[in-house]
């Protein structure tokens, strides 16, 4: 939906079927400007000069979602504004009073239990002395192109009339598309379709007033092209009291019937149209606004079908009869009614009491909110008189349901069935996109806290500035500017146009201008955050509402109060300051204060009137609480937070007084300084005298640090020497390797060896057996052995001499304790007597013979076997389990037996250690050994 797509052209309706011959009727029919359902006029674009020659298709842009359909030739679809004639028919007056206020005040679509302020468009023509003046205005409309009687300050806060300063609707019949009110996403058809056709007849007045066909154009709710089912069914939001759509037949006023309304003919109030001089309803005047006293407001379901024009379809209900009203004001009021949408299930919850002061006044030339706040005693009195007459319904209403619509509405108003312009619509699927009707400059703020109890609110008089509590869903179809706070007129006007209209208004109706000047400001406050309907792409921000534009954001999360408006400004060409799609800035404090002041003034200035009194200002406690809560919630979060922080700061300061602690510079002395106090001067000692504990601690730490264990070196210590001496290790044979921190003690001979290996001779390597054979010889040798020993090869071997110095070892015999060294022989000690010089002491002859026998190349295996047999025989002798005492020992037999029973460990005396092998000698070798 482009903002500049929709251009509104003259919407002059075709001549009425039932009254086409009357020129005055046509003039009233063209009087779309005053009958505009949404004086809040959505300024989609700068309106072109009215052109009656253009076809109807020009009214709708190519991409506009509203259906295009031909003008309906049905008389009921057109508002027939008959010439005003003097008459005394009070019945007609009663009938007329019903649509005046009730239709405008009631917004029948409310889904989430949120109140939508009645959008009564009160086209009060203050500058007119009579309806003839109104005729003049209509006549001059085509040439004027702009209503002079509209003051820039005029606007409606309670959905009555949006500021009329901007060109709401030229007298030429040019109509701006009415804004669409969404109910929780449902596009409720207000009344004005983008094609300039207004269907007020199909809009049932929540107060029981008959549906109004505000403009003389065809009553086709094109704005509601989309069915209510397009959006999710928000019927769940319906309040406890469900409103059923019922057909309410209204009395038909025959042509020529005169409607006499007594009261101030010059009442400056827009809302309180106190005096309507004798008006003749030439067309059929049907009242469909029969309100049920039990909060069951029955409104016929209006289905605007583009293809079939206006089809008033009613689910299980009779079709509403369309009304023809003399007043554009009635039209504008009707537009504030429920957003009729296709397939809307239950449109209205309650019908507000029709306020009699909303009747079309002969002076009603200004569709502004100036009259909203005017609660003058004179006007109140006149409105009361009008109410008394209006509450006396003597209209020729054949339908019993439509009888005393005013009385029913008044009773409902008195009973609190209908709130101040608030009608909660339950299960209303009126959220068709097409509801551009009554695009009130003030979209009702979104109410959250008072949703459940809104039904208790009696709607205040239209003259009263009441915050518009409307559901966010209704705002979807209502293309109003969120930021047009004080300027509820959404029509695009240049500053010159505003000034011109204001001048004209001041000239024609100074009273209205005065009231507008007085009330426009608070209205702007009320408007703030309320005009953020989905549309009004071209609305120009008014200077008055600039201060409160920030609060008209899409979702002002700073204060989610009941008065918070759901602002859809994403599609506006000229987004006001802070009126962006998601401008979540805080509400200005001034706005909240103004809102609260307006509430106070509204609720205190206008007191509860009698049943006949046009003003029913009694608001239920829930509504008042909601209003106050909304005012408080409007306060910016930052200001409230700041105030709370300041209070908390004062409380903490009182509870915890701050104690001034002087900064003391303390010089920290080093540990060394503390420990060396004994060497410091006396003054230092005195200064540290009080620090005895600290000094004691450091002293203990110093003792640990200077412990002897940390200074002890194991190597070379006395204990180390004692240990080595006890182990019989010569310290000279110990080599200390590695670094100083981790010395490694290794034997001296293994210092340069990775592995202990036998020493090799430089000439010829000799095996261990050869070395043993060279040094060992047996005393008793067989000839073979002797021959072997005399072998030249054996003789060629040099004598084995162990070089102690080169090996790095110390000769144990040379050592001091050499005498104590053990004589380790493998097989036992060798008798010195049996040993000879030819043998090496410490080596057994059998072993020697065995080793040398292998060296003999000429010997046979027999000789080797014999040698081994000898060795084994020797082993048997020496390895006996009994110990043989030495010869020199003189022991008794008992001792000898005990010693013999002990294991023989004499092999440990052998100097050469060999692992014993268990060999069983052969019999031959055993025999030879025995021989």
Curated annotation (Swiss-Prot):
Q: What is known of its domains?
A: The WXXF motifs mediate binding of accessory proteins to the ear-domain of AP-1, GGAs and AP-2 through hydrophobic interactions. Selective binding to the GAE domains of AP-1 or to the alpha-ear domain of AP-2 is tuned by the acidic context surrounding the motif and the properties of the second residue of the motif itself.
Q: Which GO terms describe its molecular function?
A: clathrin binding
Q: Where is the composition biased (Basic and acidic residues)?
A: 516-530
Residue interval(s) of motif WXXF motif 3: 476-479
Q: What is this protein called?
A: Aftiphilin
Which positions does the motif CLTCL1/Clathrin-binding occupy?
712-714
Q: Where is this region: Disordered?
A: 1-49, 371-454, 494-561, 599-636
Q: Where is the composition biased (Low complexity)?
A: 33-45, 618-631
Task: Name the gene behind this protein.
Answer: Aftph
> How is this protein organized at the quaternary level?
Self-associates. Interacts with GGA1 (via GAE domain). Interacts with GGA3 (via GAE domain), AP1G1 (via GAE domain) and AP1G2 (via GAE domain). Component of the aftiphilin/p200/gamma-synergin complex, at least composed of AFTPH/aftiphilin, HEATR5B/p200a and SYNRG/gamma-synergin, which plays a role in the AP1G1/AP-1-mediated protein trafficking from early to recycling endosomes. Within the complex interacts with HEATR5B/p200a and SYNRG/gamma-synergin; the interactions are direct.
Please spell out the taxonomic lineage of the organism that makes this protein: Eukaryota, Metazoa, Chordata, Craniata, Vertebrata
**Amino acid composition bias (Polar residues), ranges on this chain:** 371-381, 439-454
* Sites bearing Phosphothreonine, chain numbering: 613
Q: Which domain of life is it from?
A: Eukaryota
Placement of sequence motif WXXF motif 2: 433-436
**Amino acid composition bias (Acidic residues), ranges on this chain:** 19-29
Question: WXXF motif 1: where is this motif?
Answer: 28-31
List the GO cellular component terms. AP-1 adaptor complex; cytosol; nucleoplasm; perinuclear region of cytoplasm; trans-Golgi network membrane
GO terms in the biological process aspect are: intracellular transport; protein transport
């Amino acid at each position: 939906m482009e903002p500049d797509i929709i251009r509104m052209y003259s919407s002059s309706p075709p001549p009425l079927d039932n009254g086409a011959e009357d020129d005055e009727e046509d003039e009233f029919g063209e009087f779309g400007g005053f009958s505009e359902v949404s004086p809040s006029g959505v300024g989609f674009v700068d309106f072109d000069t009215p052109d009656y020659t253009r076809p109807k298709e020009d009214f709708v842009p190519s991409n506009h979602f509203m259906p295009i359909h031909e003008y309906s030739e049905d008389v009921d679809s057109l508002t027939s504004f008959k010439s005003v004639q003097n008459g005394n028919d009070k019945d007609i007056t009663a009938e007329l009073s019903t649509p005046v206020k009730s239709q405008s005040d009631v917004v029948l679509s409310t889904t989430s239990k949120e109140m939508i302020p009645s959008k009564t468009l009160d086209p009060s023509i203050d500058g007119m002395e009579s309806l003839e003046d109104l005729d003049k205005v209509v006549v001059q409309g085509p040439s004027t192109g702009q209503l002079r009687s509209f003051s820039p300050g005029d606007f409606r806060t309670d959905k009555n009339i949006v500021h009329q300063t901007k060109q709401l609707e030229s007298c030429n019949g040019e109509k701006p598309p009415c804004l669409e009110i969404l109910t929780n996403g449902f596009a409720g058809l207000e009344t004005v379709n983008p094609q300039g056709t207004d269907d007020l007849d199909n809009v049932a007045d929540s107060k029981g007033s008959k549906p109004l066909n505000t403009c003389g154009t065809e009553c086709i709710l094109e704005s509601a092209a989309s069915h209510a089912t397009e959006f999710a069914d928000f019927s769940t939001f319906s309040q406890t009291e469900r409103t059923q759509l019922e057909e309410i037949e209204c009395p038909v006023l025959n042509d020529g019937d005169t409607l006499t309304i007594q009261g101030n003919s010059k009442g400056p109030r827009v809302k309180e149209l106190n005096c309507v001089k004798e008006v003749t309803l030439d067309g059929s005047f049907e009242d469909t606004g029969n309100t049920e006293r039990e909060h069951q407001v029955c409104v016929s379901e209006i289905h605007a079908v583009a293809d079939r024009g206006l089809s008033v379809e009613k689910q299980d209900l009779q079709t509403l009869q369309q009304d023809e009203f003399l007043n554009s004001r009635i039209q504008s009021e009707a537009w504030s009614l429920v957003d009729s949408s296709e397939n809307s299930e239950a449109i209205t919850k309650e019908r507000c009491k029709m306020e009699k002061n909303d009747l079309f006044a002969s002076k009603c030339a200004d569709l502004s909110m100036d009259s909203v706040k005017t609660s003058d005693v004179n006007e109140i009195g006149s409105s009361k008189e009008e109410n008394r007459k209006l509450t006396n319904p003597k209209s020729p209403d054949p339908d019993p349901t439509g009888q005393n619509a005013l009385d029913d509405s008044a009773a409902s108003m008195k009973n609190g069935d209908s709130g101040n312009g608030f009608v909660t619509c339950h299960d209303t699927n009126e959220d068709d996109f097409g509801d551009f009707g009554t695009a009130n400059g003030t979209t009702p703020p979104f109410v959250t806290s008072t949703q459940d109890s809104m039904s208790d609110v009696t709607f205040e008089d239209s003259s009263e500035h009441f915050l518009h509590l409307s559901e966010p869903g209704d705002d979807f179809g209502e293309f109003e500017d969120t930021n047009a706070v004080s300027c509820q007129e959404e029509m695009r006007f240049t500053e010159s146009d505003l000034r011109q209209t204001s001048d004209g208004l001041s000239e024609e109706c100074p009273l209205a201008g005065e009231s507008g000047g007085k009330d426009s400001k608070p209205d702007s406050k009320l408007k703030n955050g309320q005009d953020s309907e989905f549309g009004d792409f071209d609305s120009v921000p008014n200077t008055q509402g600039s201060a409160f534009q920030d609060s008209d954001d899409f979702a002002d999360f700073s204060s989610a109060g009941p008065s918070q408006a759901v602002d859809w400004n994403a599609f506006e060409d000229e987004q006001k300051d802070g009126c962006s799609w998601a401008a979540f800035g805080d509400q200005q404090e001034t706005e909240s204060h103004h809102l609260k002041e307006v509430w106070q003034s509204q609720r205190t200035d206008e007191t509860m009137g009698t049943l006949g009194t046009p003003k029913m200002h009694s608001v239920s406690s829930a509504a008042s609480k909601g209003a106050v809560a909304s005012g408080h919630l409007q306060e910016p979060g930052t200001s409230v937070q700041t105030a709370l922080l300041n209070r908390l700061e004062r409380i903490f300061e009182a509870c915890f007084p701050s104690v001034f602690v002087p900064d003391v510079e303390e010089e920290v002395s080093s540990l060394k300084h503390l420990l060396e106090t004994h060497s410091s001067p006396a003054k230092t000692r005195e200064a540290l005298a009080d620090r005895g504990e600290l000094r004691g601690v450091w002293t203990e730490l110093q003792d640990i640090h200077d412990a002897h264990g940390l200074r002890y070196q194991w190597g070379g210590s006395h204990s180390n020497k004692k240990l080595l001496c006890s182990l019989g290790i010569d310290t000279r044979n110990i080599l200390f390797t590695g670094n100083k921190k981790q010395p490694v003690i290794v034997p001296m001979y293994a210092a340069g060896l990775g592995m202990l290996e036998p020493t090799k001779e430089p000439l010829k390597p000799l095996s261990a057996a050869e070395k043993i054979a060279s040094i060992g010889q047996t005393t008793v040798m067989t000839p073979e052995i002797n021959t072997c020993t005399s072998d030249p090869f054996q003789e060629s071997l040099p004598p084995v001499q162990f070089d102690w110095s080169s090996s790095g070892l110390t000769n144990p015999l040379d050592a001091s304790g050499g005498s104590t060294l053990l004589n380790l022989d493998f097989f036992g000690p060798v008798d010195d007597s049996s040993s000879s010089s030819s043998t090496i002491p410490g080596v057994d002859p059998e072993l020697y013979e065995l080793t040398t026998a292998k060296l003999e190349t000429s010997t046979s295996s027999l000789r080797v076997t014999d040698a081994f047999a000898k060795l084994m025989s020797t082993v048997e002798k020496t390895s006996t389990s009994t110990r043989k005492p030495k010869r020199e020992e003189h022991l008794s037999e008992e001792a000898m037996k005990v010693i013999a029973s002990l294991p023989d460990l004499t092999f440990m005396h052998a100097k050469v250690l060999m692992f014993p092998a268990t060999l069983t000698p052969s019999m031959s070798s055993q025999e030879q050994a025995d021989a």
